[in-house]
Amino acid sequence: METQRASLCLGRWSLWLLLLALVVPSASAQALSYREAVLRAVDRLNEQSSEANLYRLLELDQPPKADEDPGTPKPVSFTVKETVCPRPTRRPPELCDFKENGRVKQCVGTVTLDQIKDPLDITCNEGVRRFPWWWPFLRRPRLRRQAFPPPNVPGPRFPPPNVPGPRFPPPNFPGPRFPPPNFPGPRFPPPNFPGPPFPPPIFPGPWFPPPPPFRPPPFGPPRFPGRR
């Protein structure tokens, strides 16, 4: 009787150990690595995206401290870049080449390492400066600088320069000497034009009236004193 009970207990313990051995590998198989969880989040982002091309993981920040619970949300920060593969092709992004001058997005959020839970709690922005997940813990408070009034110091006053200007002697250059012109004057032949055939002028002389006859004045003979 005791032998049957012992065998029954041993069978129960064997069954429990067998079930435990089956459950532990299945649980470990459901857990993802940090990079696999991020890649799954990138796939979900491509599924929900309305853009023409797929995005591929470009850079992944350092993972946080390891946590035994795969269902605990873990902070994540990574960068994705646009590829040359169109989104309707459903091609794995890891097999696509990056597009030259493609768009780059910075993504932050949380992911879980459990395959069953939905890991998508990611926000992506374009043109945002990238910071690691531990950056808020290392930030130091900025010290405000004390505002001082601007200095009210008058500037230096310099007297105007009293430097005499240069004195140059007057130019003593002789003027140019040109020889007198020795050009022969023009030689014209004497004019040989016939004069106009005018008749000699006949002008009447001036007409004066004849003088009146001379009449002596009516005086007597002259008388001289001293003579009788």
Swiss-Prot record:
InterPro entries, per the entry: Cathelicidin-like, Cathelicidin_CS, Cystatin_sf
Gene3D superfamilies: 3.10.450.10
Pfam families found in the cross-reference section: Cathelicidins
Residues spanning the signal sequence: 1-29
GO terms under cellular component: extracellular space
First and last residues of every Sequence repeat: 148-157, 158-167, 168-177, 178-187, 188-197, 198-207, 208-217
Alphabetic keyword roster: Amidation, Antibiotic, Antimicrobial, Disulfide bond, Repeat, Secreted, Signal
Compartment(s) of residence: Secreted
Chain residues in the propeptide: 30-146, 226-228
Disulphide-bonded residues: 85-96, 107-124
Positions of post-translational Proline amide modification: 225
Known function: Exerts antimicrobial activity. It is more effective against Gram-negative bacteria than Gram-positive bacteria.
Entry similarity comment: Belongs to the cathelicidin family.
Protein name per its UniProtKB record: Prophenin-2
Source species of the chain: Sus scrofa
